[in-house]
């Protein structure tokens, strides 16, 4: 069967994880006067200091209650180092949070945050979603091993077909790719954790964050760049074959 090469995969997760400090590279800028907010710092990260790309922001929730006070970040973490969370208040005061007691282990480890606590670590290099629950002062560290799912893929809508993730330092991206996988001329999405959402402990219950990436608008995948968003529409493949 003739191989068909398309730019489907690359969920290219243009997550702007930012590894370059070249002048003019907006993916990575060291901040000298750190604005109010929450940041991830440490040698497990790809940031040498607080940076625009290391600030936590509101995630794509799946029907979470209005006012849910969780922020987070997709970021590459290294098993050889450690990280802490930096909070900067409106007066410029900085507070470093480390790990306290374990709150939950599934679907991902959740810890109570402690001022000056032990730094966090991960068992293997990879892309993670780090969620800071500001209401309960907790941190959830979620591995995001993306795959593809859908009737265009080998496992249909039953489960993900694994992709290989790698940090591209030169391009300041995390790239997920597949090779020699037969895909049909149908629909697919990107997903991790074998579920459509991940439950994050919150206020004695949980809130769900999308663990699937779809299209910003329904349409076919082409060889051009296609933007993804949490919980977005299905992508449509226009060519069947080995990808």
Q: PLM ranges: what are they?
A:
Residues 2-10, 18-243:
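Insoluble glucan recognition modules
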């Amino acid at each position: 069967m003739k191989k068909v090469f398309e730019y489907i995969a690359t969920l290219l997760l243009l997550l702007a994880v930012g590894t370059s400090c070249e002048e003019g590279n907006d993916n990575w800028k060291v901040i000298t006067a750190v604005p109010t907010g929450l940041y991830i710092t440490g040698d497990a990260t790809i940031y040498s200091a607080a940076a625009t790309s290391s600030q936590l922001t509101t995630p794509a929730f799946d029907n979470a209650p209005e006012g849910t006070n969780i922020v987070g970040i997709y970021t590459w973490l290294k098993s050889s180092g450690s990280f802490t969370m930096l909070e900067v208040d409106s007066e410029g005061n900085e507070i470093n949070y480390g790990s306290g007691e374990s709150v939950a282990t599934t679907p991902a480890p959740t810890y109570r945050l402690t001022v000056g606590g032990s730094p966090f670590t991960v068992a293997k290099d990879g892309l993670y979603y780090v969620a800071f629950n500001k209401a309960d002062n907790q941190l959830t560290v979620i591995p995001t091993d993306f795959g593809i799912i859908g009737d265009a893929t080998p496992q249909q809508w039953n489960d993900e077909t694994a992709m290989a993730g790698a940090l591209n330092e030169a391009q300041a991206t995390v790239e997920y790719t597949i090779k020699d996988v037969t895909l049909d001329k149908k629909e697919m999405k990107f997903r991790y954790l074998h579920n459509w959402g991940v439950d994050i402990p919150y206020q004695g219950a949980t809130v769900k964050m999308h663990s699937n990436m779809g299209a910003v608008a329904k349409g076919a995948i082409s060889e051009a760049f296609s933007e993804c968003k949490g919980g977005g529409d299905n992508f449509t493949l226009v060519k069947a074959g080995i990808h």
